[in-house]
């Protein structure tokens, strides 16, 4: 199993939107590295749902329920989507400022590649964030 972090701007797709839909098509990704990460996602991989821009924070978990397919928002077959199911809303949001301050999270792609919308997360970082979010 692999772990990922997916970013969303609340104006585009909020946690409330995800909660209502339960299963989301993750589309509109137009960065090659992020697209390659979508391609690498496997069934049942787990993603941290991260709210970007306003009060950026890790706020929920979701899992991959459909592996990559052509993004339905474009005719260009180079761009991909996956389907994600919301599985858990964190008890405590983990804000970017807290992640930046945590010594064991300093190597997260979130801090090094801040604009990347789909990024891998190590099992260690995933465990730290989930334990923290649910404590």
Tell where the protein language model's regions lie, with residue ranges.
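Short glycine/proline-enriched turns and hinge-like loops at secondary-structure junctions
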Residues: 17, 41-42, 57, 75-77
């Amino acid at each position: 199993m692999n772990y990922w972090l997916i970013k969303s701007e609340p104006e585009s797709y909020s946690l409330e939107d995800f909660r209502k839909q339960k299963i989301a098509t993750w589309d509109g990704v137009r960065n090659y590295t992020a697209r390659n990460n979508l391609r690498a996602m496997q069934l049942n991989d787990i993603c941290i749902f991260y709210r970007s821009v306003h009060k950026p924070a890790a706020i929920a978990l979701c899992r991959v329920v459909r592996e990559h397919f052509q993004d339905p928002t474009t005719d260009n077959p180079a761009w991909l989507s996956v389907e994600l199911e919301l599985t858990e809303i964190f008890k405590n949001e983990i804000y970017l400022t807290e992640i930046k301050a945590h010594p064991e999270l300093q190597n997260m792609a979130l801090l090094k590649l801040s604009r990347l919308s789909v990024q891998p997360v190590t099992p260690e970082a995933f465990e730290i964030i989930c334990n923290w979010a649910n404590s």
